[in-house]
């Protein structure tokens, strides 16, 4: 009973939905694929590349360089303090150096 109901309910919407979508999309896509889709693809590629390059330029030149310097200086200070405060635990300094190098 349950299996038969789930199959019938799942098959009917897919068939009806698939026919409606294909029937409507064939008329629109026939026109859009020839004239509008290449234009949309080109515009989308240009805008997408422009945004990605624009963001990368800002982050790589200004922000990341400054942030890396700040982190590097702060990490040096923290290393000295941690090493002076914890002379016995040398493993902590090594793990912190590895973390700083990753950034």
UniProtKB/Swiss-Prot annotation:
GO terms for biological process: chromosome condensation; nucleus organization; spermatid development; spermatogenesis. The keyword DNA-binding applies. Residues 1-103 are annotated as: Disordered. InterPro entries: PRM2 (IPR000492). One of its GO terms (cellular component) is nucleus. The modification Phosphoserine is found at residues 8, 10, 37. GO terms for molecular function: DNA binding. Residues 49-103 have a biased composition (Basic residues). Keywords: Chromosome, Developmental protein, Differentiation, DNA condensation, DNA-binding, Nucleosome core, Nucleus, Phosphoprotein, Spermatogenesis. Its main location: nucleus. Testis. It is found in: Nucleus; Chromosome. Pfam families: Protamine_P2. Residues 8-17, 39-48 have a biased composition (Basic and acidic residues). Residues 18-29 have a biased composition (Low complexity). It comes from the Eukaryota. The keyword Nucleotide-binding does not apply. Proteolytic processing into mature chains is required for histone eviction during spermatogenesis. Transition proteins (TNP1 and TNP2) are required for processing. Belongs to the protamine P2 family. Interacts with TDRP. Protamines substitute for histones in the chromatin of sperm during the haploid phase of spermatogenesis. They compact sperm DNA into a highly condensed, stable and inactive complex. This is Protamine-2. It comes from Erythrocebus patas.
């Amino acid at each position: 009973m349950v299996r038969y109901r789930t199959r019938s309910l799942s098959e009917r919407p897919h068939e009806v939905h698939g026919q409606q979508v294909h029937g409507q999309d064939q008329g629109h896509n026939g026109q859009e694929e020839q004239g509008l889709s290449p234009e949309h693809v080109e515009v989308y590629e240009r805008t997408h590349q422009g945004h990605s390059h624009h963001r990368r330029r800002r982050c790589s030149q200004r922000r990341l360089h400054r942030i890396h310097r700040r982190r590097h200086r702060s990490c040096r200070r923290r290393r000295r303090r941690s090493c002076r405060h914890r002379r016995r635990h040398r493993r902590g300094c090594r793990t912190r150096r590895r973390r700083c190098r990753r950034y």
